[in-house]
């Protein structure tokens, strides 16, 4: 039986469904290759099929699902090509953002980052991986705000869905949160010093971690990956 999921009546239904399904796919609660039924999803959320269809379209645009008219939809395997391309573009954008942020950061923004890093540490201590995953994203988004370039984050958000699946799978052992926090602290230290070269180096090292992670994860879950 499909368990109904409650939605917030004050927010757009299609966006809520998209976010929940995206999370479920990224966290591998819905495994690669799994069929997705508009009917079943509409029952789960107790809504008509229209907002579900709109959520499916956005998931497809992000490369997470395949929609085949008359044949149904299913969760895509993790595309190695998308991981490589997404990682390359994200690194190019975020390194430039970090360098710019180093020349613009204020004391109050340093405090914001400190609070985020403190919450990351708490999430690690409590083994709350979902919370850490969100705080990790928030840390990177804060940098785009400091650099006065929110569009950079919007661009990253649209291309990193496939990379996020690898990120989440790596938490267990390949790229543990403790290591990622240390890398975030290195980035923060360079920002405090307003050292653009150092922050770019720290960001590069941090984002290259995904390239190391994907090799091992693919060996352990080969059925979940494709070369396309």
Swiss-Prot record:
Which molecular-function annotations from GO does this UniProt entry contain? DNA binding; DNA-binding transcription factor activity
Which ranges does the entry annotate as DNA-binding region? 38-57
Transmembrane regions listed in the UniProt entry: none
Keywords from the UniProt entry? DNA-binding, Repressor, Transcription, Transcription regulation
Keyword Transcription in annotation? yes
HTH gntR-type domain spans which residues? 11-78
* Pfam families in alphabetical order: FCD, GntR
Q: Which SMART domains match?
A: FCD (SM00895), HTH_GNTR (SM00345)
Instruction: Give the protein's biological function.
Output: Repressor of the rspAB operon. Acts by binding directly to the upstream region of rspA.
For this protein, the record's PANTHER family field holds: HTH-TYPE TRANSCRIPTIONAL REPRESSOR RSPR, TRANSCRIPTIONAL REGULATOR, GNTR FAMILY
Name recorded for this polypeptide:
HTH-type transcriptional repressor RspR
Please report the organism this UniProt entry assigns to the protein. Escherichia coli (strain K12)
């Amino acid at each position: 039986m499909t368990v109904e999921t409650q939605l917030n009546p004050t927010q757009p239904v299609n966006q809520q469904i998209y976010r929940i399904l995206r999370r479920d796919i990224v966290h591998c609660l819905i495994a690669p290759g799994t069929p997705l039924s508009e009917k079943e999803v509409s029952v789960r959320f107790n809504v008509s099929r229209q907002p579900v269809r709109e959520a499916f379209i956005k998931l497809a645009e992000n490369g997470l699902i395949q929609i085949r008219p008359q044949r149904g939809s299913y969760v895509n395997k993790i595309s190695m090509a998308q991981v490589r391309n997404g990682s390359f573009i994200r690194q190019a954008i975020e390194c430039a953002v970090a360098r710019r942020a180093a020349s613009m950061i204020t004391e109050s923004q340093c405090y914001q980052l400190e609070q985020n890093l403190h919450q990351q540490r708490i999430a690690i201590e409590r083994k709350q991986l979902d919370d850490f995953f969100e705080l990790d994203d928030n840390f990177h988004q804060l940098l785009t705000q400091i650099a006065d370039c929110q569009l950079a984050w919007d661009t990253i958000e649209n291309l990193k869905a496939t990379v996020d699946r690898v990120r989440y799978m790596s938490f267990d052992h390949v790229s543990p949160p403790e290591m990622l926090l240390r890398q975030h602290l290195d980035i923060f230290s360079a920002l405090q010093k307003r050292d653009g070269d150092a922050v770019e180096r720290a960001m590069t090292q941090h984002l290259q971690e995904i390239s190391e992670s994907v090799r091992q994860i693919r060996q352990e879950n080969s059925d979940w990956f494709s070369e396309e």
